[in-house]
Every structure is written in structure tokens, then in C-alpha cells.
Amino acid sequence: MTRNEKTEVVAKLESEFKTAEAIVVCDYRGLSVKKLEVLRNSAKEQNVKVQVIKNTLANIALKNSDKVGMELKDTNIYLWSEDQLAVTKVAAKFEESNSDLFKIKTAYIDGEVASVDKVKALSKMPSRDELIAMLLQVWNAPIQNFTIGLNALKEKKEQSA
């Protein structure tokens, strides 16, 4: 890779990292290409970007985008998105199914370096859409129970008449 190509890669990563709400760094050593494709496809469905990046280039891009403090060693694959929950869910779900080969190392969430435990905790939280669905279900429950009661009363009166 020439110096100009490296500069272009760093500039592209820098602009993407600046808009990213969360960046998760994982160890992928030993994963087959087929399994990496599964990861990329599931990430693409959630609008999460996945890329294997050299640590030196990633360090420069992270530093230039004011996301410092992550210790990057060995082979890493980077997942990032503007949606914190989507990134953590994709990484945690893939780690569950490939725990022997894929490990979450560190993350950058909410302007600070996050531990693996925080990433896993975030991955278990419901998404915005799921929260809205839960709220609507709570709002609809009293009305639904009321209509069920009215229907039961109506049927009871019809049977007695």
C-alpha cells in the first residue's frame, strides 16, 4: 500500500469515525472467510460497518477523530455505526455464536473507552423500536381489557335473554 493510499484510507476512516456513536474492536483470529461474510451480512442489515484495518492506520484515524485511549494490539476487526445498540448487538451476537474464535476486545462508546462488560450490557438493551412497541403495549392493555370485559358482558346478557 503506497503512502497516498494510506492517507486516503486514514482520511476516509477519520470521517466515518467522527460520525460514529460507537466503535467496537474485536479479535477475529482463526475465523474463516465464510464466517466473516456472515458477520458482514448481519452488520450490513443493521447499518453497521465492518472492516479489518491495520492498527497503525486505525490509531491515526481514531486520534484524528478525537477518539483516543483504546489499546490496539494483534489482529483486529472494527465495527462502527451511528447507532450504539446496533453495533453492540451485532458484535455480542456474533461473539455468542463464535465464542472460540471471535472476542470483543474494547470499544469506544459515549465519548469514552468502554469495557467488554459494558458492550455486552448495552447489547442486551432493547432498541428504540422495541421500547416504543413495549410502551404501546402498556398503553393499549387497559383499553383492550376494557373491550374484552364489555364483550363478555354483552355475550352474558345475550345468553340470559
Swiss-Prot record:
Keyword RNA-binding attributed:
yes
Q: Which GO terms describe its biological process?
A: translation
Instruction: Give a GO molecular function annotation for the protein.
Output: large ribosomal subunit rRNA binding
Under the cellular component aspect of Gene Ontology, which terms does the record hold?
A: large ribosomal subunit
Keyword list (alphabetical) reads: Ribonucleoprotein, Ribosomal protein, RNA-binding, rRNA-binding
Which segment of the chain is annotated as a signal peptide?
none
Q: Which PROSITE patterns match?
A: RIBOSOMAL_L10
Is rRNA-binding among the key words of this record?
yes
Q: What protein family is recorded?
A: Belongs to the universal ribosomal protein uL10 family.
Q: What does this protein do?
A: Forms part of the ribosomal stalk, playing a central role in the interaction of the ribosome with GTP-bound translation factors.
Complexes and interactors:
Part of the ribosomal stalk of the 50S ribosomal subunit. The N-terminus interacts with L11 and the large rRNA to form the base of the stalk. The C-terminus forms an elongated spine to which L12 dimers bind in a sequential fashion forming a multimeric L10(L12)X complex.
- State the name under which the record lists this protein: Large ribosomal subunit protein uL10
Q: What is the lineage of its organism?
A: Bacteria, Pseudomonadati, Campylobacterota, Epsilonproteobacteria, Campylobacterales
Q: In the UniProt record, what gene is named as encoding this protein?
A: rplJ
